[in-house]
Amino acid sequence: MKGHIYKRGATYTYVVDLGKDPITNKRRQKSKGGFRTKKEAQAALAEILTEYHRGTYINESEITLKEFVKKWLELYSSTGKVKISTIRVRVHETNNILKYFKQVKLKDITGTMYQDFLLYLNTKFAENTLLGIHRTARMIFKKAVELKYIKSDPTQYSVIPKKQKTVAELESEEEIPKYFEKEELLEFLDTVKKLANPQYYTIFLTLAYTGMRIGELCALKWKDIDFKDKEIKIYKTYYNPTNNTIKYTLLPPKTRTAKRNVSIDDTLIKELKKHKTRQNKLKLTSWHDEDFVFTKIINYPGYPETPKQIELKMAQILKKSNIATLLTPHGLRHTHASLLAQAGVRLQEIMDRLGHQDDNITRNIYLHVTKDMKKEALQKFSKLMQNL
């Protein structure tokens, strides 16, 4: 760090070279004038240089929060460690931050201002949304401190406001998500077989027999299926926010536990082999051959089938069926969890199979199903004792 002094009219000014901006790579300088004597300017310059060499000097930038957020997003996106879908979430959350602070300078945002911001969010958004925005804000201000744009982090001592839950919200927490009973699942699959293209039968059978997410199913490739060892390797998910068939992306799973091997039975193996035979007969010279298991057939043949199309097809089939329970494809994941619980599989094993680290929905389904099983066991015991 270097500095010099020059005379400007009747007063003296010092200029300090602060090196290059870590984000823009441009040269940064700090100057201050109005000193009556050269000696006063030298003393002020010496104080700054001493702080700099001690590592305690920070030249707070005049940059606005909006300008810094733009730079932060560029840095955040360029690491190669963050998924596209996560970046989109961060962009959305920064928009909420900037709507509130508008053109405020980064250095002018205080802890009190940030706490007021959280109180404002608490009146507008659900708790999970508030927490997401807060996480993003903390990342932004932490990076600003790290890069010496500001001296302190205004989010550091903030307190997350809590809403008192309503009776309706407390009741909804206890609600069990919808799923098919065994008889309903069999009827649904039978209806699919009668009314839809054979590929859809294989799709819904795979979802119901593995509990995989619909994005995991759409990303599935034949190389992921080991027919010999009877298992499917799950390590990626389909991402297509624009729903443009040819502009899809395959992303790694969000969590470590989502990467897993799922055992499959002979029923599913037999159906997958039949599906592969049908697919091989359909392949044409225009086929987009990227080894996908479930693909478009007429338009864009070979491209992976989309979650939206599978959801639409399931809704159409349910309307034509006699099944009262209306589900989305994700409901087949809940169905799989409930059937495993009925079969006596332990909760942790179910969560491992579904790729969950911790999931209240799966736990609620498990407790609901096993509670009914315990009641049934007690009834059988009571009946036995009455017959003695």
Regions found by a protein language model. Give the residues of each.
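Short, basic (Lys/Arg/His-rich) helix/loop patches that form interaction surfaces
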Residues: 190-200, 210, 262, 278-289, ...
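N-terminal core-binding DNA-recognition domain of tyrosine site-specific recombinases/integrases
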Residues: 33, 37, 61, 73-149, ...
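Short, polar N-cap/turn motifs at the start of nucleic acid-interacting alpha helices
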Residues: 224-231, 324, 345-365, 375
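Basic, Lys/Arg- and aromatic-enriched nucleic-acid-binding interface segment
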Residues: 127, 131, 146, 150-152, ...
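Short N-terminal "domain-start" leader segments
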Residues: 1-11
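N-terminal DNA-binding module of tyrosine recombinases/phage integrases
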Residues: 9-13, 18-112, 277-288
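Short alpha-helical segment immediately N-terminal to, or the first helix within
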Residues: 121, 179, 206-207, 339-340, ...
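C-terminal secondary-structure termini that scaffold catalytic or DNA-interacting sites
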Residues: 229, 240-242, 247-259, 263-268, ...
